Every structure is written in structure tokens, then in C-alpha cells.
Amino acid sequence: WASGAGLAAGPDTPAGSTYIYAVTGDGDFTANTGGADYGDSFVKLTTGLVPSAYFTPYAQACMNISDQDFGSGGVMLTANTGSTYYAVAAGKQGTIFAMNLANPGGYTAPTNTTCPATGTNANIQSFTGSTHPYFTTPASWKSQIYYLPMFGAISRYNLNLTTPPTCLLRPICTGTAVKSTVTFQYGTNISISASGTTTGTAVLWAAKSSGWPSTNILQPATLYAFDAEHTVSKAIPELWDSTKCPTRDQTGNAIKFVLPTIANGAVYLGTMDRTDPTNTRGELDVFGLTSAACN
């Protein structure tokens, strides 16, 4: 279900055909025995929507019975790493998986028959990105990937572009990822705006709700802008947020999984009208550059 994320699409090799890629939540898994069920799986589909290949964690049975969806977060294709193309996805276990698109790895049964499962996933790189689950889709710009776990900070990882990479996401294997100083609750998605690949133009956007799930009360979102490229005091620096001038910039009430959308020099954020007592009327907040002072 991917927390509102869409599907991914692209070739599986430099000269390969285009495929559609999805990640699924809990459910039956029978693909390894010729069945049609792909619970907790990364699935590679032809453009005719026929499964072509897949990856399923060896712990799928345990994940399924304990509500540990692989597909609670969306799937994203990474920047090209030489002749090998990858996708990344992460779910409720807090594990980030990197799949080789040409050969996602299939399924390898665990070495035990009880939970927690033990074993090895074939042709897969996996990393413990967080002790909390992921309910978000990652974002990327050039060779950088950004991930946000529930109740955590945004983490920035640099792709290892060697061929083939022995460790696709360098900081997870060799050190600590750079993180934002702001932490986020459940339901925040992140996006990037930039002037193409021009250095110094990349901005990372995220909309935070402080009301749900801690109080279950609707509250205005806070839209944040971060410097997507640089590091200040070992952290991702904040550039701006919508609480700086609340009389002008306050948003409507936050909606989980809403993605800040960038087009034509503006940022669009879907919210709920905070003046509506029935909480049924939507609101579209639009942010852009201004020279006007806050008043």
C-alpha cells in the first residue's frame, strides 16, 4: 500500500526494456511455488502487468503474521550505478532493501521454521536504516537519497557509484547518515525541487503534523524547506518553515501521506480547511517566493 506512493517505472539495465515496479504489504505468498500471491514483495512487472521477477524477504511468513509490511513505504529507482540498476524500498521493520532490477533475487527460504526467522536474502543488499518503521517514499537528487522513518529525522545517504557497488548506500555501511535536526511523526512524505542538476538549487520539502497520532487531533501542518545538498554542524540545515510567519504562511490541517508538490516555481500542499468544524472540506495551500516582509 506504500503510504500513498505511486508505482515506479524504468529499464532494468542500460539497454533493457521498461518495467513497472511495485512493493506490496502483508498477505499470502505463493509465488515461490508457482502461485499468484506476492505478499510482502518487490514485484517487477511487464508493461502488460505480468510479473517478470520479484524479491521476497526470507522472513515473509513472520512479517505477515506480525503486521510488518514490507510495502508500508514506497519504491524508488536510484541513480544509475554503472551497468547495474537498483531500486530501494523500506517497510515497517526499519530495513532498507536495495534490489538489482535485472535480478531482484526471488525468495530464499529461512533456515528455521519459527519466528523470528533467520536466513539470507539472495542478491540483495539490506541495511537497518531505523529502529522505527517507514511510512514514506524516499526522495533523491543526483547521487543522494533521503529517507524518513516514523518518529525520526530525515536521513541523507550517498550512493556508491562504483561498479558493482559492494555497499550501495555508503553511510549505512561506513558511518552515520547526515540527518535533519527536525523529527517527524507518522504520515510525512518528502520531495525535492531543483533547477535540473544545477548545484546549489536543491531543496528538500516535508510537511509535519504534530497532532496525529500523539493526540489524534487535527492541527495545521508545518511545511519545512531544507538544504538538500549541504551539511551544517553535521546536520541537514533548515532553510525555512511555515511557522516563521504564521499570519501569512499557516497551512490548513495536516493530512497524512500528502506529498509537497513542486511546479512552476511554487510548492503545493493539500490540507483540510481548519475553519471547517466538520473536517470535510479540503484546502490547497500554495507557497512561492516573495519579497514582502512578514506582518
Where are the model-predicted features located?
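Extracytoplasmic/lumenal domain signature
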Residues: 1, 9-21, 26-72, 76-295
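Acidic/polar loop-and-plug regions of large Gram-negative outer-membrane beta-barrel proteins
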Residues: 5
